[in-house]
Swiss-Prot record:
<dbReference type="GO" id="GO:0005576">
    <property type="term" value="C:extracellular region"/>
</dbReference>
<keyword id="KW-0964">Secreted</keyword>
<keyword id="KW-0281">Fimbrium</keyword>
<feature type="propeptide">
    <location>
        <begin position="1"/>
        <end position="15"/>
    </location>
</feature>
<dbReference type="InterPro" id="IPR007166">
    <property type="entry name" value="Class3_signal_pept_motif"/>
</dbReference>
<dbReference type="GO" id="GO:0009986">
    <property type="term" value="C:cell surface"/>
</dbReference>
<protein>
    <recommendedName>
        <fullName>Probable pilin MJ0431</fullName>
    </recommendedName>
</protein>
<dbReference type="GO" id="GO:0016020">
    <property type="term" value="C:membrane"/>
</dbReference>
<feature type="short sequence motif" description="QXSXEXXXL">
    <location>
        <begin position="16"/>
        <end position="24"/>
    </location>
</feature>
<dbReference type="Pfam" id="PF04021">
    <property type="entry name" value="Class_IIIsignal"/>
</dbReference>
Length: 75
């Protein structure tokens, strides 16, 4: 019975959504937009960070491989 009261409150007599539901939907959309903005912002910085880390890894492996090659030449 409580569900029917909520349903009646959400819907007006003409079957249109009430102002409360409109505000609730607008708030949900706003939260989704804000969350998407921060997700994209963090994804962008994560890509840059991954690029820097991969470049550093390539440099380390290049240095180590050069070191091993020079050690082999000394044998």
């Amino acid at each position: 019975m409580g569900k029917m009261k909520i349903l009646k409150k959400l819907l007006s007599k003409k079957g249109q959504l009430s102002m409360e539901v409109g505000v609730l939907v607008a708030a949900a959309v706003l939260v989704a937009i804000i969350a998407a903005y921060f997700y994209v912002k963090n994804a962008k910085s994560a890509v840059a960070s991954a690029g820097n880390k991969s470049a550093a890894f390539i440099n380390v492996t290049a240095n180590k491989s050069q070191e091993y090659i020079s050690n082999l030449s000394n044998i």
